[in-house]
Amino acid sequence: MPWPFSSSSSAGSPTHSQKEDGARSKPTSWNDLLPKPDPPLHAAKEWAPVFLTSVASLAAFIFYQSRLRRFPTAGHIQPDLFRKRTLLGRVTSVGDGDNFHMFHTPGGRLAGWDWLRKVPTTKTALKGKTIPVRMAGIDAPEGAHFGRPGQPGAAEALQWLRSYILDKRIWVRIHRRDQYDRVVATVYVRRFLFKKDVGLEMLKLGLATTYEAKSGVEWGGAEEAYKAAEAKAQSKRLGIWNGEASTFESPRAYKTRTNETEGKKSEWFSGWS
C-alpha cells in the first residue's frame, strides 16, 4: 500500500540504490572496455591542419625557388631555366653598345625592392652581385678596347643605350649563357605604358646591325622583325648606314679583321722568340 501523501509516479520509480544495482548487474564484455576508434571524419578534422600546413610550406618553398630567389651572377642561374624565365632587374652599368650589367630584383616592388630593399650603387657593393647581359640578335659597333680603335657609331650607340636603360628597371628574357659567362637575352624596358624591345629599338635607329653568324644566333622569336627594322633603317640611311656603302664594315667583319691582324702579329713575334 503506497504512502497516502506520496505520488504514484514516485512510488513506481526505482530508487538510487536500485539504479546502482542495475548498473552493476549489466554484463560487460572485454571489447566494451577497449577504446573506440575515431570515426574517419573526426580523424580527418584532426589531421587536416597538419596536412594543409605542410602543403602550404611546400608551395611557399617552390614559389620562392621559382620566383623570389635572387641570382647574384650568371653562374647562379640553373641551365633548365633558360628559355623559360624572364628576370626583373635594374641596370647598374652599360659597358658597350650591346651589353650591360644588371642587379636581379625578383618580385620587384611587391617583394620590397626600391622601398624596403635597395639596390647597391657603389662598385664595391656591386662586385660579384650582378649579371652580365649580352643583348640577343643584334651587334652594335665595337668601341675602343685593348688598344683597338673604335668603329664609327660606337660612341653614339653606347650613349643612347646608357640614356635608355641605365638605372632603369628592365625585363630580361634569358636564352642561354655564352662563352664569356654572359646571359644572352632579349631585353625590355618600360616606356610610358608599353614595354619596348631594346634591341629592336636600336635596329630601328640604325645604332646596330642584326647579328651575323651562320648558326647559333639567338633571336628570341624576333628574327623577321629585327631584319625588317634593319632593312628599313638602312634604306633611310640612319645611324651607321649614313656613310658610303662601299666603305661600311659591320661589327662582325670588324672583329674578324682585327682578330686576324692580331693573330698575324702574334705569329710574327713568336717567330722572333
Swiss-Prot record:
Keyword hit for Hydrolase: yes
Domain TNase-like residues, every copy: 85-243
Location within or outside the cell: Mitochondrion; Membrane
A GO term for molecular function: endonuclease activity
Compositionally skewed regions (Basic and acidic residues) per UniProt: 257-267
Compositionally biased tracts (Low complexity): 1-16
Residues forming the catalytic site: R134, E142, R182
PROSITE patterns: TNASE_3 (PS50830)
Keyword annotations of the record: Calcium, Endonuclease, Hydrolase, Membrane, Metal-binding, Mitochondrion, Nuclease, Transmembrane, Transmembrane helix
The enzyme's E.C. designation: 3.1.-.-
Transmembrane segments: 47-64
Any Pfam family hit: SNase
Protein name: Probable endonuclease LCL3
